[in-house]
């Protein structure tokens, strides 16, 4: 229920090759700009191939090859009205590592931490901004990540809500209200 989707500042975080953000641009055709943040350079070429197929010159797609820890910096503070994200699911030491370093970086918080990820979302959300991301609860690993999110955010103006559950994965909504 954003009044002017054309001015909506959107981020696809942990973007991979950008498919989720690109798909969003088809469902919300009034969107004019999307930033994509990904740490793995292997996705860069695929991202540019994907946007070449979009054929919508009114869209501005910006690719940032960086760690989400960068979102803690002033430059990114209060920057996005909408964030969508499919982050890693597993904590180091929980779950089976793959022989592939590439797959492990997709699946595990190896380049930073879960706490840093949540703080990065909170810092980069604008007032009244919303972030949607996937979260594996990991209760079978003895973890309660949703409770961890609430603890991380308790001294902030950001709230967390479980809005749906799909095949063992929760969809989490963070909202910032200053």
Task: Tell where the protein language model's regions lie, with residue ranges.
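Conserved Class I SAM-dependent methyltransferase catalytic core
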Residues: 113-173
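Short amphipathic alpha-helical segments
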Residues: 48-49, 95-98, 144-150
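A short alpha-helix capping/helix-coil boundary motif
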Residues: 27, 97-100, 123-128
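Conserved SAM/SAH cofactor-binding pocket of Class I
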Residues: 2-76, 85, 91-93
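Short, Asp-centered acidic motifs that coordinate Mg2+ and/or phosphate
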Residues: 82
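C-terminal lobe and adjacent flexible extensions of AdoMet/dcAdoMet transferase-like proteins
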Residues: 174-178
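Mobile active-site "lid"/loop adjacent to the S-adenosyl-L-methionine
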Residues: 87-116
